[in-house]
Amino acid sequence: MGKKATDHHILSVILGNGGHFPAGEPQSGVGSWDVFTKVGGDIGISHSWQAGLSYWSAPDVQDRTGASHAHDGATETAAFSGSSHIAGLDFVYKWAPRGNPEQRNFKLQFEYFQRDEDGDIVMQGSDPLESSSYTGKQRGWYAQGVYQFMPQWATGVRYDRVSTDNQGSDDAILEEASLNNAEYRPERYSAMLQWKNSEYSRLRFQYNLDRSTGEDDNQFFVQYTFVLGSHGAHTY
């Protein structure tokens, strides 16, 4: 007979005062809120999965400061006031023969986020005071797969990408605030081979094709990781 599914469901709601990025100044009441849920379970005895949704919102951000620069001897700092919202999606799939990952296993992982903002940018310290309307949309996602083909060996690939679409009434002010980057589409391809000596040490060889600057950047890494002392159990 097949193994009984072990489904799980998690729901969480968090209220905050809006005093941490990407919100702005703390408020006396509820300045931000966050809700997320995760569901998952087993498919037979060799497969399992988990999916999650999250949403964060700060409807009244006040004076969130960001990029600054010197102009004619004075320092100008970009401050955003308006609304900010972030939505996220994540998914994990795991495979192991008859539920035993010691010899072979595979893990597929995906995550996506999107931030939407609407409000105004003010260059604090400018004289006369400079401002611009601002509507921004930033997206990012990655997908990766790791296959352990022997007890001590694993290989994997990964793809990352982010994009922006920022609009406003004054492009010069958005550029000063480091927000005038509608054509910015950085991406990266990665591949790795890993040898695990034990639970506490591993050696990884990794190659990245990084296009975050618009140019091809070939990167090679050799990484050795080890753990000293006891450590907690791994999460899903």
Label every PLM stretch briefly.
Residues 1-4, 39-41, 93-95, 147-149, ...:
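Residue-level signature of outer-membrane beta-barrel architecture
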Residues 182, 186-203:
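C-terminal structured "cap/appendage" subdomains that terminate the fold
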Residues 89-91, 195, 217-236:
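Outer-membrane beta-barrel "beta-signal"
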Residues 1-61:
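Aromatic- and glycine-enriched pocket-lining scaffold segments that form the walls
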Residues 12-16, 50-56, 109-113, 158-160, ...:
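Transmembrane beta-strands of outer-membrane beta-barrel proteins
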Residues 29-33, 83-87, 137-141, 185-189, ...:
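Residues that define the transmembrane beta-barrel architecture of outer-membrane proteins
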Residues 46-179:
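Detector for outer-membrane/organellar transmembrane beta-barrel domains
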